[in-house]
Amino acid sequence: MLSKKNFNKICLEVRRNIIELIYNAGSGHLGSSLSIVELMVYLYFVQINFNNKHRDKIILSKGHAAPCLYGVAMEKKILEKNFKYLRKIGSKLQGHPDRKFFNHIDLGTGALGQGLSVAIGYGIASYLQKKKFNAYCILGDGELQEGQIWEAAMYIGSKKILNVCTIIDNNKFQNEMTVKETLDLGNLQKKFESFGFKVVKINGHRFSEISKILTKFKKKFY
């Protein structure tokens, strides 16, 4: 079991990795990567058993936060610590996750808005194959301006796809300005609840809150 002290230590190292990667590349999405550090560390170090053939699935729908994924993978010893190859041709560290180079993610993402639909596919596959696994889909709040997200949300609520955990990184910023200035999303909680979601708001940087809600979610299916 990962202690809070060790969790925080890993998160600090991941932050350093992210900054090193983006600094050496000369470009990258710093804010989007830093805003999901604790969540990604918890998923990779606690929530998911990568030795299980039928393990839970992770979909980083906001794929531009790939530096966080790589930073976590370095601390997990999945990737070696080499900060010189982010966004280089032929590198494992592409600007967006690419399963050809990195198979510890379950979807290669680039164009925003598609991840939740794929998570539904994994959720249905779990039922059809009679295998117990969940799908965790990390969405950006700016990404919610994509229409496909709401089609997927409608389907999840209507068909009761209960083994998909939809996680929204509500950091309130996108490329050049705030999400509200670009296209105000209104009350997200009420929107998702209207589709039949059970919505829980947490501080995504707190170990205790992440642990509580993800443990509760997983226990529903195991």
Sequence positions of predicted segments:
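Cofactor-binding active-site loop characterized by glycine-rich and histidine/acidic residues
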Residues: 18-21, 33-158
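Non-catalytic, mobile gating and regulatory segments of ester bond hydrolases
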Residues: 1-6
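General structural feature for long, well-ordered alpha-helical segments within catalytic domains
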Residues: 10, 14-18, 32-36, 65, ...
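Short glycine-centered, acidic/aromatic-flanked micro-motifs in structured strand/loop junctions
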Residues: 25-26, 109, 139-140, 168, ...
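A broad detector of the eukaryotic-type serine/threonine protein kinase catalytic domain
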Residues: 19, 23, 140, 172, ...
